[in-house]
Amino acid sequence: MELEVRHLRALCAIADAGSLHRAARRLGVAQPTLSTQLTRIEQALGGPLFTRERTGCRPTPLGRTVLGRARPLLTDMNTLVREARAAAAGGDSRLRVGSTASRALAGWLRRLRRPGLEPTLQMDVSANALLRRVTDGQLDVAFVHEVEGCALHIPEDLRLRVLVEREPQFVMLPADHPAAARPVVRLADLADDRWMVDPTVDGEWDGVHRMLRAVGLNPRVLHGDYHTAASLVATGEVVTVCQPSSQSRPDTAVRRLYGDPLGVRLLLAGTRAELDAVFPALEDAYWEAARQSTAYREWLEGGGIRTLPRCPVAATGGGRVSCGRAEGSRSRRPRDVAPPRPIG
């Protein structure tokens, strides 16, 4: 059997997912099919590439060597396809943007649009899914958020720009809720409320659960997407975490949580050239949206740090990167960050 590009993609998917089950789901194939394919690849290369354990799969020394060569090859192949498609389009370049939900999106796309460049948008609640699409050549850049304490699976061949190191998450509650009368809400004030979270958003459930558990709360939790949550907040059924750039409405109130107990890191992922080209527009669009939110603007003016900090990236294993909270002033020239490559 000769190795093909699809085989290399399968190996990288297994390494990034950490298990055959999760990798098969991401690739859209049955697990037995992927397992059979892996066995054939290992036979062709002369040895096992992963150790199978109850908790998942880990690359063997041979596997790390193969993955170290496979990832650059996939990057080059994706670049070849992207450049060929652009040339075939006669120079009418399309910038393929992926993003999780953000109020900065409209302003960002507006700033990117110009003669000869038409941005397209793919939305997904899963940041990990968007990052994989960039690696696979389906997207050029992806704007994602990483919930504090819930590291994303960031492929080694992506480069990152940190837009905001720690964006505090606020709470949306009914406008007539007693706690809405104050500009800052304590979690204890919401002890009797039901919460709604979206379990399909990478890290959201874990982050909210950890935040509530830290203050001794174990509230009733419903599952639903953001639009469902906003509707139920308006009718007084639930409260929910929200982006600080969210705006209050006549029937809902957006308030800061005391102590800012939950934060996310905002990242732009892509190739270096693409990041350099589109990051300034994203930066401007984000702070424009921030100023339009009364609650976020007051937080910033009251001492919240408008920061695009520098933070070294540390390997945590499994193709992940994590970064601690950073303090500092906002920089106009953020450094791009490359995830560490495995040794071997």
From Swiss-Prot:
Highest taxon of source: Bacteria
Chain segments carrying region Disordered: 322-344
Known DNA-binding region: 20-39
SUPFAM superfamilies, sorted: Periplasmic binding protein-like II, Winged helix' DNA-binding domain
InterPro entries linked: LysR_subst-bd, Tscrpt_reg_HTH_LysR, WH-like_DNA-bd_sf, WH_DNA-bd_sf
Keyword terms: Activator, DNA-binding, Transcription, Transcription regulation
A Pfam family: HTH_1
Residue ranges constituting the HTH lysR-type domain according to the UniProt record: 1-60
GO MF term set: DNA binding; DNA-binding transcription factor activity
UniProt GO cellular component terms: protein-DNA complex
Biased composition (Basic and acidic residues): 327-338
Family: Belongs to the LysR transcriptional regulatory family.
PANTHER family: SMALL NEUTRAL PROTEASE REGULATORY PROTEIN, TRANSCRIPTIONAL DUAL REGULATOR HCAR-RELATED
Function: Transcriptional activator of the gene (snpA) for the small neutral protease.
Name of protein: Small neutral protease regulatory protein
Gene: mprR
